[in-house]
Amino acid sequence: MTLAGADHEAIRQVARSFAEREITPFAAEWDRTESVPRELYNKMAEVGLMGMMIDPEWGGSGLDFTSYVLAMEEISAADGGIANVMAANNSPVAIAIQQVGSDQQKRDYLTRLTSGEWIGSIHLTEPHTGSDASAITTRATRDGDEWVLTGTKAFITAGALSDVAMIIAVTDPDGGKRGISAFITPTDNPGYRVLAKENKLGHRTNDTCQIAFDEMRVPASDMLGEEGRGLGIALSNLSLGRIGVAAQAVGGARAALAAAHSYAKERETFGRPIIDHQAIAFKLADMATQIEAARQLYFHAAGLRDRGLECAREAAMAKLFASEMAERVASEAIQIHGGYGFLNDYPVEKIYRDVRVYQIYEGTSEVQK
């Protein structure tokens, strides 16, 4: 469903209101403890944030992609780590099931994912394989009516939190890119093992894990889509992911600007608020301009996608510009705070830690170029 501008603004306001009420007041504490109450995701589902592009018959909101990324910006402005769990659940996991899943898989998984009962995770990256996704080594070997999965995945968002995993594995070692398949399966399988929860610079409100598949047996019916089409399934929505990261970056940068602007109005030097000093005012103006430019880039790319047009180049541009912009803006926000910006008493310290990853995941800045 493609919506009009007024509808998009209404969706943005729903997401913003939720974020300001349910996330912002608690984000610093959740960052400190590296834990988020599971019921938060149930609450997100109640307002339609966990299955935004999924058809209503499966419990989703049936909205367009632009609605999704606008909501993503709002959640990311409150906390980047929580926004990333929302992203993984919506796309690629739920979207992939809707696009290529069997009727049984849709019945088994989609309503649980959209309701917040279950959370999904995507298992593609491996310890030595990031941007070169076709070089993965996790194996799936057929054994009667089952597949046996062995291997290790790395940097898995919500790897410990999630209830269902979309796993990309090699089913035909001689098949090249056509020898890779996708599986969708619950994580309560005894062969699914969390090796480590990573200690991260930022995004501490979600768990990022290394996952091992120890002779993990899954029924043949857990294959997602056709055999040999796994890499295509994983990468088919890559542009969606990159536009989503651009929206996350804009959200983080916007939070940094808001914090810097507020501080600049309160902090006084030489008898007046520092916002009245041209050096600071110019910084804030530049920050606001860069944020709006990044927003227009991701909004344009999302609009192309909603119209069924090719958007790979525009998605890469949006992610590249927005992710690097977010670090610059967060850095300037710290500078405006002076020494206080280096302390975790002020939000810009956390924001800076959170935005740094946007230049890395969903394809590094170098890959976008």
Whereabouts are the PLM-identified features?
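Flexible, small-/acidic-enriched active-site or ligand-binding loops
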Residues: A135, D188-P219
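Short Ser/Thr-interspersed hydrophobic loop/turn segments at strand-loop and sheet-helix junctions
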Residues: G48, M72-S76, A169, T185-P190, ...
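Alpha-helical interface subdomain recognition
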Residues: M1-A88, V100-Q105, R112-E117, D132, ...
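Short glycine/proline-enriched turns and hinge-like loops at secondary-structure junctions
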Residues: L63, D132-S134, A158-D163, G176-G179, ...
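A short core secondary-structure module
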Residues: E146, T150-V194
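Flexible, glycine-rich active-site loops centered on histidine and acidic residues
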Residues: A94-V100, I122, S134
